[in-house]
Amino acid sequence: MNRRLTFFHGRHKGVERNVIISGAQQIFTPEDETETELIEDDRPYAGWLFLGLGYQTRFENQLDTLELRLGVIGPAALGKEAQDFIHDLRGFAKFQGWDNQLRNEPGVIAVWEHKRKKGYMNTNSRFGVDVIGHAGFALGNVGTYANAGAEFRMGWAIPDDFGTSAIRPGGENSTPNSVWNPSIAVDRNWGLHAFVSFDVRLVAQDIFLDGNTFKTSHSVDKEHVVADAAVGLSFLYRGVKLSYAHIFRSKQFELQDHSHSYGSLAISYTF
């Protein structure tokens, strides 16, 4: 089926295509876990449960991704139940304000992103560097924005993909034909590289800050420019990729006390 979808690069010889199916749950809470009443100067409680269908085309060192995510926001997304389960499992205190979460609403977001990379590799030592630029936009009641950024990688046996997968719509990078390349690996086994990346978004709509679309709900005044920066390390063994990144995010709404940072550990297998 995906061979019939040619709207990105037509029928150019060498175009590779990929269909991606995904699913996830995201949970958003204010900082104060003990307050049961509405916290007017902090972000709303919200859950977002969705399925995603994506389509990728790769032509030489370019990658286009089109993704549609459909789901539900509100109590039906089971954000409270999922968070309570994890907190019970780990012995953490539960957040007490879930009665103030966003109301049930269907959620949809359509995303397009284009990536282009340039790089160099020493065929003897396999040491290389590359730079991957990206730009795109999203439309939907979940979010509407335009974004752009880049990732710089340096190390040994850098994989033939488009960077470390970002936790954002359209950020998937396990591209067509990005399988482990044994010709650039020591003993055909391993690789290691460091990376630095950034992404800047111009935000018109963010339901998790603006509140429900068709019903009255809690909301805060969002920042219209939001930036992410990340530093990390990826280790590869055959088709397994283990990555750790530390992400720094600027303030997302005007009354936010401080910027946010968090760690991300990801493991993937390409075959």
Language-model-derived ranges and their functions:
Residues 3, 25, 55-57, 114-118, ...:
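Residue-level signature of outer-membrane beta-barrel architecture
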Residues 37-40, 94-100, 136, 215-219, ...:
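Extracellular loop and loop/strand-boundary signature of outer-membrane beta-barrel proteins
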Residues 31-35, 151, 157-271:
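Outer membrane beta-barrel transmembrane domains
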Residues 21-27, 68-74, 114, 131-141, ...:
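Transmembrane beta-barrel strands of outer-membrane/channel proteins
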Residues 28-32, 73-77, 117-121, 138-142, ...:
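Sequence/structural signature of outer-membrane beta-barrel proteins
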Residues 2-17, 58-65, 118-131, 157-168, ...:
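Short loop/turn motifs that connect adjacent beta-strands in outer-membrane beta-barrel proteins
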